[in-house]
């Protein structure tokens, strides 16, 4: 699945299971932006990229093709990509780090607006060895800054850490991997909702 599809799926499950009687009170809100991110990243990184999931996909489409192997190779191969949402698990945190560094420079008044693009390009060349060819794969690829959302990027890294902790602490995750049936996925989602 695309990261967008898994992102929407788990966020909706998370939102729909907030306590409705406390919807407009602090108890009814998400714990934090990082916890919110962790919900989609848990599914994206630990369910939808697991060998178990790709075995299911392989049986749905056509057992004669080795889709499982192709999917696993695609999702578990390090390929440096200039686009954050298409980045592999190795370089994704570096994308977040670069944005965080630039935001710090902006808020310390160490950089002018017109210098952001050059700083972005230099950091991508230095950290990821990518020589960017356009602004759409560079400084203009995210919507956060145009919407005035600053300081959000670290929630992606923290969300990934929380998602890994959820995986580690949820015994139902291992049960699902060993026996991926509808009941076990429902039990896993119920556990996430309750915890």
PLM regions and their residue ranges:
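C-terminal, non-catalytic "cap/extension" segments appended to globular domains
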Residues: 96, 100-195
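Acidic/His metal-coordination segments adjacent to aromatic residues that form catalytic metal sites
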Residues: 20-25, 29, 78-84, 138-148
């Amino acid at each position: 699945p695309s990261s967008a599809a898994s992102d929407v799926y788990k966020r909706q499950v998370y939102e729909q299971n907030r306590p409705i009687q406390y919807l407009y009170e602090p108890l009814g809100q998400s714990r934090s932006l990082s916890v919110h991110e962790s919900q989609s990243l848990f599914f994206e990184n630990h369910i939808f990229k697991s060998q178990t999931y790709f075995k299911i996909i392989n049986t749905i489409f056509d057992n004669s093709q080795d889709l499982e192997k192709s999917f696993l190779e695609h999702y578990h191969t390090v390929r440096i990509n200039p686009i954050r949402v298409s980045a592999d698990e190795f370089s994704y945190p570096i994308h977040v780090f670069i944005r965080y560094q630039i935001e710090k420079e902006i808020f310390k008044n160490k950089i002018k607006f017109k210098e952001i693009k050059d700083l972005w390009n230099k950091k991508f060349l230095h950290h990821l060895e990518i020589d960017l060819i356009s602004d759409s794969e560079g400084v203009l690829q995210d919507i956060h800054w145009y919407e005035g959302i600053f300081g959000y990027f670290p929630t992606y890294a923290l969300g990934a850490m929380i998602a890994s902790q959820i995986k580690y602490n949820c015994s139902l995750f291992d049960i699902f991997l060993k026996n991926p049936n509808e009941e076990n996925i429902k039990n896993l989602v119920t556990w996430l909702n309750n915890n």
